[in-house]
Amino acid sequence: MKKKAGILTTYFAANYGAMLQPFALKRVLEQQGCDVEVIRYGQPDIVKSYSPFYWGRYFQAKVTSAIAAWLFAPWAIAKELRFRRFMYRYINGEQGFAKEIPADKDVYYVGSDQLWRTFGKDEHFDPVYMGFFETRPGARKVSYAVSGEHLELNAVNQEYLRRAMANFDMISVREQTRADDFAPLAGGKPVEVVLDPTLLATPDLFAELESRDPLPGKRYAVFYCVRRSQRFIHRIYEYVQAKGLELVVFSEGFKPSLISFALRHRGVHYLMTAGEEAFLGAMRYAECVFTPSFHGSVFAIINHRDLYSLLVEDGHDTRTRHLLSLLGMEHRLWAIGQPMQTSEIDYDRAEASLKQLREHSMDFIHRSLN
């Protein structure tokens, strides 16, 4: 009889990595013979942050933010609908959010992504992501590759985490720094470091997904802009001009400075409403990739692209630093004031490291199911 597995994560956010990681974990578990459901839990703070249909964003305290939300609403809605089509096709075909966590699973996987952190102005934890939900007797709760980069480990948070970790039968995180932080709070349970699902899955799984080349027949670079990395755009443009490339730009949210830059510079294509299909195609066909994004770096690595991992130096570069250090690619980290590194990436070495890390991560999955 098939084991029933449930996944709790930010599957609904119109963000490239947020949807690709639950797809990957779902398919890996299905390959282990599981009946898998990505549970339709909509974490309220994340829903409000991403959804253009949350009307509160149009009446914000900051007038400039409210005006920007109104101006970009048509593009935000178009992008949201593209991501929803992907979600219904590949992740969970049911619309809306579940009113409660289904209690019929044998194993519940919480992860991956930034789930073990605080949300909102009052800095609260999400009780579901922290394992405070009812299950049938004998069901297991497992954290898989959770991250908590945006988390202050003060005394109050440590006490909450200590109680929350008691909910879990097995614990794994994505970064060694968090494993070191959480180990004293885990009640003696080991806190293991495992690969993000997008790297746990073998690359052939992503061939199942529809993708399209956003600039067929053209040579181009990709800039995936998240956080405040738009300040790199002039340096990136100098590089692509010197190489005779065009530039395809993706972003999280909408960046007015990038709109202006694309209008004023030849060969810059800012794909404001692009969905997963264009992202996957661009990561496959681009000659090089510039991004501070963890998942942007992941898909450049999967496709053996020439990666420049941008250091925004805002306190949130930990995840990418850790990944590149595991793969012997630290030389591809680039801060704005530094010269670009042009030495080649040794992808044979990186793949050898990934093979070992996949084996350990799959061992964790096997133990969680048995």
Regions found by a protein language model. Give the residues of each.
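Active-site anion-handling motifs in enzyme catalytic cores
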Residues: 1-370
